[in-house]
């Protein structure tokens, strides 16, 4: 098996399971790791989970698209979910999304304390205009990243 050193994280292989509904909670993350993934990424975690889009799948006549915007688990609930995910070993990357650099920094510090091995900044979301705008401006991405690091 091809071992990988990714940003100092020792992984048994280079397969990283991306954020999505299959990684919606600790059990899903743990199952992805048990299936052989080198690392897993949580669904995007936000500080306010009040918006709950349903249905989660949008069909346009040509195909279907997952339109679930982010995790419906409150930030404090991720302490338990990360413990479950990591109970079998493995690397868990927390994906976070926020409107301001300070909110990103808050989420990152919480998830680091909860046991996340790394943080992914989720700044591209075609369903949410404000985040789409963020993703198209390198200077804004720089400022958000600087606040988290």
Where are these regions (language model features)?
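Active-site entrance/lid segments in N-terminal catalytic domains of soluble metabolic enzymes
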Residues: 3-11, 16-22, 26-149
């Amino acid at each position: 098996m091809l071992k990988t050193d990714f940003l100092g994280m020792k992984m048994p292989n280079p397969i990283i399971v991306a954020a999505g509904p299959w990684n919606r909670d600790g059990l899903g993350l743990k199952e992805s790791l048990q299936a052989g993934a080198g690392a897993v990424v949580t669904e995007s975690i936000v500080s306010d989970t009040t918006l709950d889009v349903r249905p989660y799948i949008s069909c346009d006549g040509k195909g279907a698209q997952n339109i679930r915007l982010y995790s419906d688990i409150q930030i404090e609930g991720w302490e338990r979910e990360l413990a479950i995910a990591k109970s079998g070993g493995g690397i868990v990357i927390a994906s976070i999304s926020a409107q301001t650099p300070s909110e990103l920094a808050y989420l990152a510090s919480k998830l680091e304390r909860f046991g996340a091995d790394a943080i992914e900044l989720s700044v591209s979301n075609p369903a949410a205009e404000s985040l789409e705008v963020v993703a198209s401006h390198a200077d804004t991405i720089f400022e958000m990243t600087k606040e988290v690091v």
